[in-house]
Swiss-Prot record:
Residues 1-11, 528-537, 563-583 have a biased composition (Basic and acidic residues). It comes from Homo sapiens (Human). InterPro entries: C144A/B/C (IPR040118). Residues 224-234 have a biased composition (Acidic residues). Residues 129-150, 165-178, 453-467 have a biased composition (Polar residues). Belongs to the CCDC144 family. The gene is CCDC144BP. The keyword S-adenosyl-L-methionine does not apply. It comes from the Eukaryota. This is Putative coiled-coil domain-containing protein 144B. Residues 543-552 have a biased composition (Low complexity). Residues 1-25, 87-188, 213-260, 453-485, 528-586 are annotated as: Disordered. Residues 215-244, 490-546, 648-713 form a coiled coil. The lineage of its organism: Eukaryota, Metazoa, Chordata, Craniata, Vertebrata.
Length: 725
């Protein structure tokens, strides 16, 4: 058995100090856990009790389960153990009582006070060898634990947790027992019981107990320091008694509980401070709730007025270039809006007109909101409101000019681009066909590159511009109210520049969209024309082939009519026929390759010429083959010509497929641009809604500020009237 702490401080008559006794429980109670017990080394009963219990627990595994630890005890958390030690050392009886039994209504106050005094060394009664329980009553011995089981029926059951300490002071049931033959009654015997502090834990708790239970010298010095600090606290708090009358009202109640033992009570305790802090926090919460109620009432009143006059919130869908017509709507706003609102003056009328004018310009997102927010940060400064009004008027004048200029520039730019487009088309039609084919190739490559860059830049540019707008709008609301007017003007100019860039990008996207639509229409027309040409060529070829077959059947008649030509053709060498065949191939293939490489806008004329030339060559070959029907190479020649025609048709079909692919690409581009336009419209609507919400909040806050100022001015006016009267 190990113990920490000193012997009796003042000999036999001094108050004992707390000590910790270590035991190890067997498997039947806990699986070999170290347990620590708190007691007084001067109290022989407590030391003998812990030692005998430890011996019995080591000796037998059946008896310790029904020992003193099975008595009802109080639960104490590990976090409150340090507070209990400090309260016991400093003599803070209410603090110990608060830790041991914070809500125990079943224990009598007097019994609880007597049990707590055992833990407080300053107030424990001086013991003599005659008053010890083992000298007066031999039955009262640690081995006879049945008495404690009988007398401790009123206290609570001890539930030992794995990591939670507990204190078990014994509570007497019979308080009216009398002293006979020098024996003490149960209450005075149990005054000697200092309790058992059960610490289930580890070596950290052992170190904690050593640090909180020093030896004699260290404990004496600590007690002296505590007395000095308690005296200083008394002097400090005597000066605060006039300011805090609630603390003095709590002291007599504490004195009533402890009037029989004449225990001095300290004026300030931790739980008193906590209660005061809770009271202050409750006051703050009530104040905040009142403010919220006032703001809600103001919002409701503003909503009623808003519904009554129906201020236009935001248009659903409007054209992009109609800002010049929006300025006229400001005159139609009813001026009775400010007269019907209670507490509003002429300044409110100007402020409302300013906010409504901002609603008529949705492109201007946030220039004057920052200036309007300043009165919210400085509710008691009157100059800020005038600055806000003047700056908002300035912004309005500038934004009107900017919107007019933007509209003029945008319309002029669109007309100029349309004119240029038509002029370019007319000049291209007037050029030579050869020059047109070369330039169309270059234009096609340039258009492909431009479309790729457009796909990349349009997606990234619009999103990046919107993302770049967001932090600036947020920074406007988060700027400090003490910023100079120069910084405000600078931010306003930056925001206008960003908005102008955004407008320009939207205009360019619209122009590109229109150009793509026109190109799409042209491509559709060209594809239809080419399909018609293919159909006509196929019908002509089928007709010529049928003529050739009929001619092949009537070869005998031709031989009778033209015998000389037959002989001449028969006498021709095979080389000559081969050369003619190669010439025909050279005539057909280069034109086919040329047709494959040409642009769709010039294919129509070239295809007509090509089909006509191929048809003539084909007819010449058929005539030659008619003359050379006896030649063995006549049949392969016909097959070769037929294959050439099929190859030509395949090339044209491939060209049609390429055109369809281009059409699909253009349609995809159009859909992408439409999505981007819809997204930009959505962002505009969202920004307008945010702007309107912020203006509503500003209006509510201004009303609240004016009402508060009116409430503050009312008592001043009353005082002035009283003084004047």
């Amino acid at each position: 058995m190990a113990s920490w702490g000193g012997e009796k401080r003042g000999g036999a008559e001094g108050s004992p100090k707390l000590a910790v006794y270590a035991t190890r429980k067997t498997r039947s109670v806990r699986s070999q856990e170290d347990q620590w017990y708190l007691g007084y080394p001067g109290d022989q009963w407590s030391s003998g009790f812990s030692y005998s219990w430890w011996k019995n627990s080591v000796g037998s595994e059946s008896k310790h389960g029904e020992g003193a630890l099975d008595q009802p005890q109080h639960d104490v958390r590990l976090e409150d153990l340090g507070e209990l030690h400090r309260a016991a050392r400093s003599g803070d009886v209410p603090g110990v009582e608060h830790v041991l039994a914070p809500g125990d209504t079943g224990v009598d106050k007097r019994d609880r006070k007597k049990s707590i005094q055992q833990l407080v060394p300053e107030y424990k009664e001086k013991q003599t060898p005659e008053s010890l329980p083992q000298n007066n009553n031999p039955d009262w011995h640690p081995t006879n634990l049945t008495l404690s089981d009988e007398t401790c029926q009123r206290s609570k059951n001890l539930k030992v947790g794995d990591k939670s300490p507990s204190v078990s002071p014994s509570m007497p049931e019979n308080q009216s027992a009398t002293k006979e033959l020098g024996q003490m009654n149960l209450t005075e015997r149990e005054k000697m019981d200092t309790g058992v502090v059960l610490l289930s834990g580890n070596d950290t708790l052992h170190d904690l107990c050593q640090s909180q239970l020093p030896e004699n010298k260290e404990s004496k010095e600590a007690e002296q320091d505590l007395e000095l600090t308690s005296e200083e606290e008394q002097e400090r708090l005597k000066g605060c008694e006039n300011k805090q009358p609630q603390k003095t009202s709590q002291e007599p109640e504490m004195a009533k509980d402890c009037d029989r033992e004449d225990i001095p009570i300290y004026p300030v305790l931790p739980h008193v401070q906590k209660s005061e802090e809770m009271w202050i926090e409750q006051g703050k919460l009530e104040w905040k709730n009142q403010l919220k109620l006032v703001i809600n009432e103001l919002k409701q009143r503003f909503g009623e007025i808003y519904e009554k006059y129906k201020i236009p919130a935001c248009p659903e869908e409007e054209p992009l270039l109609d800002n010049s017509t929006r300025g006229t709507d400001v005159k139609d706003i009813p001026f009775n809006l400010t007269n019907n609102i209670p507490g509003c003056e002429e300044e409110d009328a100007s402020e409302i007109s300013v906010s409504v004018v901002f609603e008529t310009f949705p492109e201007q997102k946030e220039p004057s909101l920052k200036n309007i927010i300043h009165p919210y940060y400085h509710p008691y400064s009157g100059s800020q409101e005038h600055v806000c009004q003047s700056s908002s008027k300035l912004h309005l004048h500038e934004n009107k000019l900017d919107c007019d200029n933007d509209n003029k520039l945008g319309i002029g730019h669109i007309f100029s681009t349309d004119n240029n487009f038509h002029n370019d088309a007319s000049t291209k039609k007037a050029r030579n066909p050869e020059v047109v084919t070369v330039e169309m190739k270059e234009d096609q490559e340039f258009d492909l590159q431009m479309t790729k860059n457009m796909n990349q830049n349009s997606d990234s540019g619009s999103t990046n511009n919107y993302k770049s707008l967001k932090p600036k709008l947020e920074n406007l609301s988060s700027l400090p109210p003490d910023s100079d007017r120069t910084s405000e003007v600078y931010l306003h100019e930056e925001l206008q520049q960003d908005m102008q860039k955004f407008k320009n990008e939207v205009n360019t996207l619209e122009e590109e969209f229109l150009a793509l639509k026109k190109e799409n229409v042209q491509l559709h027309k060209e594809v239809e024309e080419e399909m018609e040409k293919h159909r006509s060529n196929s019908t002509e070829l089928s007709g010529t082939l049928t003529d050739g077959t009929t001619v092949g059947n009537d070869d005998d008649g031709l031989n009778q009519q033209i015998p000389r030509k037959e002989n001449e053709e028969h006498d021709r060498p095979a080389d000559k026929t081969a050369n003619e065949k190669n010439k025909v191939k050279n005539q057909i293939y280069p034109e086919a390759d040329f047709a494959d490489s040409m642009e769709p806008s010039e294919i129509a004329s070239e295809d007509c010429e090509l089909s006509h030339s191929v048809y003539e060559n084909f007819m010449l070959l058929i005539e030659q083959l008619r003359m050379e029907y006896k030649d063995s190479a006549s049949l392969p020649r016909i097959q070769d010509t037929f294959c050439l025609c099929e190859h030509l048709l395949k090339l044209k079909n491939n060209h049609c497929d390429q055109l369809t692919v281009k059409l699909k690409q253009m349609e995809n581009m159009v859909s992408v641009l439409q999505n981007e336009l819809s997204e930009t419209k959505k962002t505009k609507l969202q920004l307008e809604l945010q702007k309107i919400e912020w203006e509503k909040e500003l209006y509510d806050l201004r009303l609240a500020l004016k009402q508060e100022n009116g409430r503050k001015e009312m008592p001043i006016c009353c005082i002035i009237k009283i003084v004047n009267s």
